[in-house]
């Protein structure tokens, strides 16, 4: 079980995973892991689960077996989980790991372009729409963005289109807390994403 620490995080698959007689191993960096795995490797102080996987591979003595493709996957996970190394990334060991991944022949600049600079036109227009309706609460150093089911339909929303939206308000000077409310397109529920910086 990678990068999730509670069965409820995997929605419909939770019952299947819970009922599976297979041995379960959790590798994760989120706080308060649930006790549903035989082995739990949980380190919230680590920046990403991908970094944790890399450390585990090296601890077991298999660094030489990491392929270029494997190194690309690890780097991509580290990069996306830290917002392009803009938060939770002050540990100097992260950059030692990156240098080790570079030794496998990865092109980190190309990976960045493919992850962050290949969006569809509709996603970009959706982002503009969401930001144009953003509400900033200056007295609280906070911002709120939202997206209804109807609005998603208007912009031909596909799963993942709003990934990272919650981080954008944090680029506003003095905004330390961001909340993103998105109406689910399949279930009668609203998904809430929260982000903060500093000591908010």
Region spans (language model):
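Short beta-strand segments
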Residues: 1-3, 28, 77, 145-148, ...
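Hydrophobic/aromatic beta-strand patches that form the interior of the parallel beta-sheet core
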Residues: 23-27, 39-42, 143, 179-181
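Short, glycine/charged-enriched secondary-structure capping and boundary segments
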Residues: 13-17, 39-42, 92-93, 194-195
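Solvent-exposed alpha-helices and their adjacent loops that cap or buttress functional pockets
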Residues: 16-19, 33-34, 66-68, 77, ...
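Hydrophobic helix-and-loop "lid/oligomerization" segment in the mid-to-C-terminal part
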Residues: 82-200
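Short alpha-helices
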Residues: 29-97
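Active-site cofactor/cluster-binding pocket
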Residues: 1-39
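Fold-independent oxyanion-binding glycine-rich loops
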Residues: 2-5, 27-30, 56, 82, ...
